[in-house]
């Protein structure tokens, strides 16, 4: 029996003791990247829609504010704006794209509809030095940035000066060094602006003077105290999916409350080669976490027989998972809390930019509907973290890197990597092909370079020749992409020798396959997964 240390104090907010930056969201598709860039500097950041910005600013008391981009025009009636209290509070403010335009207009400058719209890569010329550029850019230099705007600032507010210009933006960057207000027409948060992260670092560290103490070690200690304060002597059930998020959540909660936690691992028969055994061994044998392992593969595969529509596959798997999990929870009995691996992007995506509910947590793909049905309170220890931070926390908790660093795996598992009807035979073929592919990627030293790689079993057969005989067997598709966030992705440019050797192994070693193809589709227009 593992007994937790008793909490001596309650920690209502894991980030309360740290410097914080508030990010006001005006609807940009890449606002999450701003938060990630700030977090990379060891400073906690939080995103709120502009409608809630004043309330959040008062409650959060941030040391700096960043105004995001957005699709609106400040020239339209009723256009989104930042609370004026932000500009009078004495904190540094950084405006990005729409954030620059609303800052300029609200403080007395002028914005006009652009006759020269800029979308994509653009060159800017640095016309003067400022604190944002220290150690990065110098007067007279030209640099590539990523633009996405129609309107542009044409008259500076009082106290500002222009420090950069571009073909479509005569005032591409503005600076008020006295008030520490800075703004730029381009997007520094995206990788297409090569020096963008350095500019954000300068704003965070040099302009705002923040110390950067938001670390996973600090988060671990504070989250443990928060879990103990919330749970007390209650019991917690955590559904393990075999993925990184639920695994890290379970280990963190177990460190906080010991055997008050019971994990339920539902094996739906759609996992990768030896994955179920790995999960059981890690949690039951290595961490000694109470674990209920349910082999429900026959139930899932029986219900999925004949189902070909990908959305119906997902819904069927989700419904069955809830049924099985609910049944096991009743057997355990006495649980007061349900633990979920909700991440910060799930929280952000459920906040309506245009209005509506303030915050609605998006349910985890496997346990949606469980809290309402089971009448349990939620424990979500990772809800302030991005995926890369969860991996870092996992390493801090001692989870093996081979587990923490695994590529993303969808909740419905191999069901959506097997287009068409799912059968045990097809799943066996797919598991073997996928295992060989990943083994070859690891052997080539490419696993950590690639964001995600997997095999797909296509619902077609082709004619082949093996020895002196004709074959009519399945086609395996190989997929590998590079990405920073999964929002966009490029196919990985393997050399032909690697692809040839991998294809030869799969065809020779996996019975039922006589052809292998490689997917060279980027996202967009394609998605990373096939279904």
From Swiss-Prot:
ATP binds at residues 241-247. GO terms for molecular function: ATP binding; GMP synthase activity. InterPro entries: Class_I_gatase-like, GATASE, GMP_synth_C, GMP_synth_GATase, GMP_synthase, GMPS_ATP_PPase_dom, NAD/GMP_synthase, Rossmann-like_a/b/a_fold. One of its GO terms (cellular component) is cytosol. It holds the Pfam family GATase. The keyword Signal does not apply. Residues 214-406 form the GMPS ATP-PPase domain. PANTHER family: GMP SYNTHASE [GLUTAMINE-HYDROLYZING] (PTHR11922:SF2), GMP SYNTHASE-RELATED (PTHR11922). NCBIfam families: guaA_Cterm, guaA_Nterm, PRK00074.1. This is GMP synthase [glutamine-hydrolyzing]. It comes from Afipia carboxidovorans (strain ATCC 49405 / DSM 1227 / KCTC 32145 / OM5). The lineage of its organism: Bacteria, Pseudomonadati, Pseudomonadota, Alphaproteobacteria, Hyphomicrobiales.
